[in-house]
C-alpha cells in the first residue's frame, strides 16, 4: 500500500455493496487515510457488522484477465447509523444507486461533516451533480465530482458473504466532471482509477460527463420495452437474454430505432444545458465494447453523427449483431466464440418481508429516465421517445400489481413524482449560469 494521499484524506464509502468493495481496494492501493463505510440499517448491514466483528475484511476477486485486481482491504470503521458519524472525513464516495443520491445526501448529518472537501458520485446521471449540490447545506464548500459511470462490472458473489465481490470486467475509459473545474481532486481520482487500468478523461462540466453514462442510452430502449418487461415480470418460462436479438432477446429494429431517437432527445437536452453531445456509435465502440473493423469500418463510426437516421439505425444494429459473441475471444475446437450476449434477465422476486421487488434493471433505469424527462420539461423539450419508454414500463408494472395484489408489492414498484427533484436541478442550474 502506498503512503496516504493527503488530497484524499480520510475516505467514507457511503453504501457498502459490490461497487464499494472495488473502490475500497483501489483506494487502499493508491493510498488513502482512514477508510470507513456507512450502510443503511437492515438485515444486510447486520450481516456486514457481524462479519467485521469476526475480523473479516473486504475481499475482491478479479476474473480472467483481471485476476491481478484481486486483494483484500480492511475497514477502519463501519457505521449503520448516520448519527454515529463524526467530523473525521475529508472525502465521501457515494456508492449507492444513483436514484437514491438525493435521499442519501439529505440523510447525512452535515453539521458533523464540516471537514468534507469532496463528494464523488460513482455513477452519475444527467443532472445528478446539480441535484446533490442543491441538497447540500448553506455554507458547505465541498466539491462534487461526477463519474460518467461505474468503471467496472462487479457483483457480490454470495449474499451470505456480503464482503466478498467479483470483478469480471473493467472499462477502458470513463469521464469525470467537477463542480469546480480547477479542483485538484480530479487529478487525484485520475490516479486512483489508473491503478485499475482505467483512463479518466476530465471534461469541462459535470453535465458533459453525466451525458456519457452508457446505461442511459442502452438500458432504457432495451429494458423498458415490452419484451424485456414480460420476462422480468414473469416467474414462468425462459428468462430471455439481455443482449440477444429477438426472439432470444429484446434487440429488434424497433428497439434500435428507439435507441437512436432517445440519443437525439438526450443530445438536445445536453446542448441546452451547455454540454457537448456524443457520437453514440463511437462512444459504444471505443469506450465500451469494440467490434472488428470488418463489421464497422472506422469511417462509419467516426461519421455516425452526420449520417441519416436509417443509416444510423443500420450501424447500431450491426454493432449489436457483432457482439452476440465476444469477437476478440479465442475460438473453441468447433470454431465458436464466447457467447458474450447470453446474460439472462433477473426477474422479480420476493424480499425478506415477502413483498415483490423489481431488480435494479429496470427499476433504476426507469427512475433515472423519469427524472431526466421531468428536467427536460424545464427546457421545453417533450422527449416523446423517452416518454413512450416510461409509459411502457408503467403499464407493464401496473398490470403486474393488479395481478399480484397491491398488498403483495413493495412500494418501490409504484411510479414516483420526479418533478420536485427536477425542479431542484433546474434551480441549481439557473444559479450557476
From Swiss-Prot:
It is a single-pass membrane protein. Its EC number is 1.5.1.-. It comes from the Bacteria. It is found in: Cell membrane. It catalyses: pseudopaline + NAD(+) + H2O = (2S)-2-amino-4-{[(1S)-1-carboxy-2-(1H-imidazol-4-yl)ethyl]amino}butanoate + 2-oxoglutarate + NADH + H(+). GO terms for cellular component: plasma membrane. InterPro entries: NAD(P)-bd_dom_sf (IPR036291), Opine_metallophore_DH (IPR016935). It is an enzyme of class 1 (oxidoreductase). The active site is at residue 219. NAD(+) binds at residues 16-19, 39-40, 154, 364. One of its GO terms (molecular function) is oxidoreductase activity. Keywords: Cell membrane, Membrane, NAD, Oxidoreductase, Transmembrane, Transmembrane helix. The chain crosses the membrane at residues 7-27. Induction: Is part of the operon cntOLMI that is negatively regulated by zinc level through the Zur repressor, which leads to transcriptional activation of this operon under zinc depletion. Belongs to the staphylopine dehydrogenase family. Catalyzes the NADH-dependent reductive condensation of alpha-ketoglutarate to the intermediate formed by the adjacently encoded enzyme CntL, namely (2S)-2-amino-4-{[(1S)-1-carboxy-2-(1H-imidazol-4-yl)ethyl]amino}butanoate, leading to the production of pseudopaline. This is the last step in the biosynthesis of the metallophore pseudopaline, which is involved in the acquisition of nickel and zinc, and thus enables bacterial growth inside the host, where metal access is limited. Therefore, this enzyme probably contributes to Pseudomonas virulence. Homodimer. Interacts with CntL. This is Pseudopaline synthase. It comes from Pseudomonas aeruginosa (strain UCBPP-PA14). The gene is cntM.
Amino acid at each position: 500500500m502506498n503512503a496516504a494521499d493527503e488530497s484524499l484524506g480520510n475516505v467514507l464509502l457511503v453504501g457498502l455493496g459490490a461497487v464499494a468493495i472495488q473502490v475500497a481496494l483501489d483506494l487502499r492501493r493508491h493510498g488513502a487515510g482512514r477508510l470507513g463505510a456507512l450502510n443503511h440499517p437492515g438485515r444486510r448491514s447486520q450481516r456486514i457488522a457481524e462479519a467485521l466483528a469476526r475480523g473479516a475484511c473486504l475481499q475482491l476477486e478479479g476474473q480472467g484477465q483481471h485476476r491481478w485486481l484481486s486483494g483484500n482491504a480492511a475497514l477502519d470503521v463501519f457505521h449503520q447509523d448516520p448519527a454515529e458519524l463524526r467530523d473525521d472525513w475529508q472525502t465521501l464516495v457515494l456508492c449507492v444507486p444513483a436514484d437514491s443520491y438525493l435521499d442519501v445526501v439529505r440523510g447525512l448529518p452535515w453539521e458533523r461533516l464540516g471537514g468534507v472537501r469532496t463528494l464523488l458520485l460513482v455513477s452519475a446521471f444527467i443532472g445528478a451533480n446539480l441535484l446533490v449540490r442543491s441538497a447540500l447545506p448553506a455554507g458547505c464548500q465541498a466539491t462534487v465530482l461526477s463519474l460518467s459511470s461505474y468503471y467496472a462490472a462487479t457483483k457480490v458473489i454470495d449474499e451470505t458473504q456480503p464482503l466478498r465481490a467479483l470483478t469480471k470486467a473493467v472499462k477502458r475509459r470513463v469521464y469525470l466532471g467537477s463542480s469546480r473545474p480547477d479542483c485538484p481532486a480530479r487529478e487525484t481520482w485520475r490516479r486512483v482509477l489508473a491503478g485499475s487500468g482505467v483512463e479518466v478523461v476530465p471534461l469541462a462540466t459535470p453535465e458533459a460527463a453525466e451525458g456519457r453514462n452508457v446505461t442511459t442510452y442502452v438500458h432504457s430502449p432495451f429494458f423498458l420495452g415490452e419484451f424485456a418487461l414480460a420476462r422480468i415480470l414473469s416467474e414462468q418460462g425462459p428468462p430471455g437474454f439481455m443482449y440477444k436479438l429477438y426472439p432470444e432477446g429484446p434487440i429488434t429494429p424497433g428497439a434500435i430505432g428507439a435507441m437512436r431517437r432517445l440519443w437525439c432527445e438526450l443530445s438536445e437536452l445536453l446542448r441546452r444545458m451547455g454540454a457537448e453531445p456524443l457520437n453514440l456509435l463511437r462512444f459504444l465502440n471505443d469506450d465500451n465494447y469494440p467490434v472488428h473493423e470488418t463489421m464497422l469500418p472506422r469511417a462509419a463510426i467516426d461519421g455516425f453523427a452526420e449520417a441519416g437516421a436509417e443509416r444510423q439505425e443500420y450501424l447500431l444494429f450491426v454493432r449489436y449483431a457483432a457482439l452476440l459473441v465476444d469477437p476478440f475471444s479465442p475460438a473453441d475446437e468447433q470454431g465458436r466464440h464466447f457467447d458474450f450476449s447470453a446474460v439472462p434477465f433477473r426477474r422479480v422476486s420476493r424480499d425478506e418481508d415477502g413483498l415483490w421487488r423489481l431488480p435494479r434493471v429496470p427499476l433504476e433505469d426507469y427512475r433515472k429516465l423519469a427524472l431526466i424527462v421531468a428536467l427536460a420539461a424545464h427546457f421545453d423539450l417533450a422527449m416523446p421517445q423517452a416518454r413512450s419508454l416510461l409509459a411502457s414500463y408503467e403499464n407493464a408494472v401496473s398490470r403486474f400489481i393488479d395481478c399480484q395484489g397491491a398488498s403483495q408489492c413493495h412500494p418501490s414498484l409504484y411510479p414516483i413524482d420526479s418533478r420536485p427533484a427536477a425542479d431542484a436541478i433546474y434551480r441549481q442550474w439557473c444559479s450557476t449560469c
